[in-house]
């Protein structure tokens, strides 16, 4: 089970199949912007900067796999990414950024054949992509974590919900298959 790797491969294939400037091998990296030196060819940094448990889906009930067994619910998380384009000139960076924004606007759900690896097998039938509108202060704080790098235009997106199955084995239970109710009536005297 490698959910994060499968998510990364899904993002990478999705972008490479839709943005011509990023089709070359090695043009999409999952490194921190602090680790990237300006390349000669266009490149996109897809940096996972935060992982948060999804509080809305935290209380999901168990999933019955057989009449007498259930699985503990999966851990449901939200993944926060910043997408930062790199190119020789600012014009190409802006073109790549515009195409990223357009791609995620037009395709806000990853599903079906778009999902790579074992994402579907692990309960991730669809993963939504939505803009994470960071304020200027939040973006500034994020870029302060890369002290040797100058601020670069970035877009922040959240992928949600991402399900990570429980590592516990199925729990055996005795389910009520039939219920018998006896109703007795007491005679009332008038």
Feature locations, PLM:
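Active-site-adjacent structural patch at catalytic or cofactor/ligand-binding sites
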Residues: 47-86
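Short structured motifs
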Residues: 30-32, 65-66, 139-142
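Charged, amphipathic alpha-helical segments and their flanking helix caps
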Residues: 1-21, 70-124, 162-190
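Broad gene-expression machinery/nucleic-acid interaction feature
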Residues: 41-45, 76-82, 152-156
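Short glycine/proline-enriched loop/turn "hinge" motifs that connect secondary-structure elements
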Residues: 38-39, 70-75, 147-151
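Acidic-leaning, charged glycine-interspersed low-complexity segments
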Residues: 95, 106-160
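Flexible glycine-/small-residue-rich
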Residues: 48-50, 158-161
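Small/polar-rich, solvent-exposed N-terminal microdomains that initiate assembly or binding
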Residues: 1-61, 117-123
């Amino acid at each position: 089970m490698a959910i994060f790797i499968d998510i990364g491969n899904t993002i990478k294939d999705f972008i490479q199949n839709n943005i011509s400037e990023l089709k070359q091998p090695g043009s999409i990296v999952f490194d921190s912007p602090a680790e990237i030196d300006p390349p000669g060819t266009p490149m996109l940094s897809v940096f996972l900067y935060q992982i948060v448990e999804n509080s809305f889906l935290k209380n999901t009930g168990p999933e019955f796999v057989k009449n007498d067994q259930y699985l503990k619910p999966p851990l449901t998380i939200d993944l926060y990414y910043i997408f930062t384009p790199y190119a020789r000139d600012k014009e190409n960076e802006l073109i790549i950024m515009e195409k990223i924004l357009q791609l995620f606007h037009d395709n806000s759900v990853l599903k079906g054949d778009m999902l790579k690896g074992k994402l579907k097998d692990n309960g991730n039938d669809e993963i939504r992509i939505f803009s994470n509108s960071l304020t200027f202060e939040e973006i500034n704080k994020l870029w302060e974590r890369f002290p040797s790098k100058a601020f670069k235009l970035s877009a922040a997106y959240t992928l949600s919900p991402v399900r990570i199955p429980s590592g516990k084995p199925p729990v055996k239970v005795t389910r009520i298959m039939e219920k018998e109710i006896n109703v007795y009536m007491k005679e009332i005297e008038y």
